[in-house]
Each structure stands twice: as C-alpha cells, then as structure tokens.
C-alpha cells in the first residue's frame, strides 16, 4: 500500500519541471517549487521568497517539534514544509515520509538555485540538502488539514 503522502509526492513530481515564476524552472527555485506543490494540492501558501514564506508559515501554520514529527505528519498525508531563513535568501523544502537520515532528518523534495547540491527529488533528506550547521536549525511547519487521504472503498 502507498503511503498517505503519495498525493504530495505526485504533486512534487508534477511540479518539478514546471515554472512557478515565468522562465525559472521550479527545480532551480525552492520557493517556486513549494508554491507549485501547494497550488496543485489546493493548500494556501504564503507568497514570496523563502524568507517571506518562512515568516508566513510561522504565522499561519503549526510548527512541529522535530524532523521525526515532520516525517510522521507527512506519512499521515499532511503537507509539511521545512524552512530556514537566511541573510539574503533562505531555503524551503517539502517533507515526505521515509527513513530518517541519522535518525532525525526527514526525506524531502526541493528545488534550489545552488543546483544539484541543494536539490532533491525525494532521494535526499533535509540533513543532506542543508549544511551541517543549518540542518539542526530547521523549522518544520504542517498545514492544518490533511492533503491526502485513503481512497474510498467502492
């Protein structure tokens, strides 16, 4: 049986090669990628660059205590965003279910202006996308309503 977050993974796959901002592929734009995934799922998302998005998530979404809790919520079908503000540009990613890297970092999907080193198509954890200093400062936010659910029996 698929994990309940399969619809989120599918939205990530569908958003990867699209452009949220004209001319900028989502795989090269973390905030555009997250915006596209949220739009596909019908989830309201704060607008702007990653720093602005983290500010908005802090105000309107529920903050989670750990990467393990973030992975658990993702496995339950909730859209979970990992984010960290930066001096100029921060970074945001979509958390998905799966094994925790080093027992605390959840798997993720994210675009990045840094190219392959900062990108993940669900095969890297936030602990591999962010550097060793920043990965322990990440915040995790969950949307209040589940984005995925089990199919109804016919």
Swiss-Prot record:
Role according to the record: Toxin secreted by the H1 type VI (H1-T6SS) secretion system into the periplasm of recipient cells. Degrades peptidoglycan via amidase activity thereby helping itself to compete with other bacteria. To protect itself, the bacterium synthesizes immunity protein Tsi1 that specifically interacts with and inactivates cognate toxin.
The record ties this protein, via InterPro entries, to: Papain-like_cys_pep_sf
Per the UniProt entry, the disulfide pairs are 7-148
Q: Name one GO cellular component term.
A: host cell membrane
Highest taxon of source: Bacteria
Organism whose genome encodes this protein: Pseudomonas aeruginosa (strain ATCC 15692 / DSM 22644 / CIP 104116 / JCM 14847 / LMG 12228 / 1C / PRS 101 / PAO1)
What name does this protein carry?
A: Peptidoglycan amidase Tse1
The molecular function terms of the Gene Ontology recorded here are: amidase activity
């Amino acid at each position: 049986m698929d994990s309940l977050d399969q619809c989120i993974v599918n939205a990530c796959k569908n958003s990867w090669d699209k452009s949220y901002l004209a001319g900028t592929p989502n795989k090269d734009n973390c905030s555009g990628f997250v915006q596209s995934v949220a739009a596909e799922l019908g989830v309201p998302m704060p607008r702007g660059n990653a720093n602005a998005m983290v500010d908005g998530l802090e105000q309107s979404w529920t903050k989670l205590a750990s990467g393990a809790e973030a992975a658990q919520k993702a496995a339950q079908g909730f859209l979970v965003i990992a984010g960290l503000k930066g001096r100029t540009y921060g970074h945001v990613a979509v958390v998905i279910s799966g094994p925790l890297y080093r027992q605390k970092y959840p798997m993720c999907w994210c675009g990045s202006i840094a190219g392959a080193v900062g990108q993940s198509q669900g095969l890297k954890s936030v602990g591999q996308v962010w550097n060793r200093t920043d990965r322990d400062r990440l915040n995790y936010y969950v949307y209040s309503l589940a984005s995925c659910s089990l199919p109804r029996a016919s």
